[in-house]
């Protein structure tokens, strides 16, 4: 069960009649470290979402890893739709805390929960679709970043194997983008 004290709270700005989320624990910690980020609405499970500029991604990922978020559970991408942005997302977990609990039972408080945070990098569809690779920080991002490149066209600077993972090398376009047009016919080029 999620502790209500760690879920960012929606507050109304009466001067501008807009709504803004109060920072969660991770966001407050990042602010204390001097790292620039954007507070986003928590997901349906109450997990804190943080918007990150591409230029800040590696610094924030390194800071979070040093703060215990040592496991990249998932990395991927999605398309917000026609005219929308492309998004590269990262789900980070404090797995070390859980591992310590299993090695030495009864070290966690009985009501402790799995600590997780989600990072999102928003990219303009017609802009620069390049994000720094997190491979040097989380080796598990290898194939996940390649799949995101293959399906959405988001390239990862500094990735050691920047090539398609699922589609043939000569494939045109990115199949999971909302503006993708399916070809009527594709003849695979066999490299003999």
UniProtKB/Swiss-Prot annotation:
Its EC number is 7.1.1.-. InterPro entries: NADH_DH_suC, NADH_quin_OxRdtase_su_C/D-like, NADH_UbQ_OxRdtase_30kDa_su, NADH_UbQ_OxRdtase_CS. It catalyses: a quinone + NADH + H(+) = a quinol + NAD(+). It is found in: Plastid, Organellar chromatophore thylakoid membrane. GO terms for cellular component: organellar chromatophore thylakoid membrane; plasma membrane; plastid. It comes from the Eukaryota. Keywords: Membrane, NAD, NADP, Organellar chromatophore, Plastid, Plastoquinone, Quinone, Thylakoid, Translocase, Transport. Its main location: plastid. PROSITE patterns: COMPLEX1_30K (PS00542). GO terms for molecular function: NADH dehydrogenase (ubiquinone) activity; NADH:ubiquinone reductase (non-electrogenic) activity; quinone binding. PANTHER family: NADH DEHYDROGENASE [UBIQUINONE] IRON-SULFUR PROTEIN 3, MITOCHONDRIAL, NADH DEHYDROGENASE UBIQUINONE IRON-SULFUR PROTEIN 3. NDH is composed of at least 16 different subunits, 5 of which are encoded in the nucleus. NDH-1 shuttles electrons from NADH, via FMN and iron-sulfur (Fe-S) centers, to quinones in the respiratory chain. Couples the redox reaction to proton translocation (for every two electrons transferred, four hydrogen ions are translocated across the cytoplasmic membrane), and thus conserves the redox energy in a proton gradient. Belongs to the complex I 30 kDa subunit family. This is NAD(P)H-quinone oxidoreductase subunit J, organellar chromatophore. It comes from Paulinella chromatophora. The gene is ndhJ.
């Amino acid at each position: 069960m999620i502790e209500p004290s760690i879920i960012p709270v929606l507050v109304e700005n009466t001067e501008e009649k807009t709504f803004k989320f109060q920072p969660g624990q991770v966001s407050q910690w990042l602010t204390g470290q001097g790292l620039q980020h954007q507070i986003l609405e928590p997901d349906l499970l109450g997990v804190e979402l943080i918007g990150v500029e591409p230029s800040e991604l590696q610094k924030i990922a390194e800071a979070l890893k040093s703060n215990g978020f040592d496991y990249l559970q998932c990395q991927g991408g999605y398309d917000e739709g026609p005219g929308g942005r492309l998004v590269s997302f990262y789900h980070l977990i404090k797995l070390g805390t859980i591992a310590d609990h299993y090695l030495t039972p009864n070290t966690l408080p009985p009501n402790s929960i799995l600590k997780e945070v989600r990072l999102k990098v928003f990219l303009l569809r017609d802009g620069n679709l390049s994000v720094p690779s997190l491979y040097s920080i989380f080796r598990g991002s290898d194939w996940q970043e390649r799949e995101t490149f293959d399906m959405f066209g988001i390239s990862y600077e500094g990735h050691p194997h920047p090539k398609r993972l699922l589609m043939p090398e000569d494939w045109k376009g990115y199949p999971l983008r909302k503006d993708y047009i399916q070809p009527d016919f594709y003849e695979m080029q066999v490299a003999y």
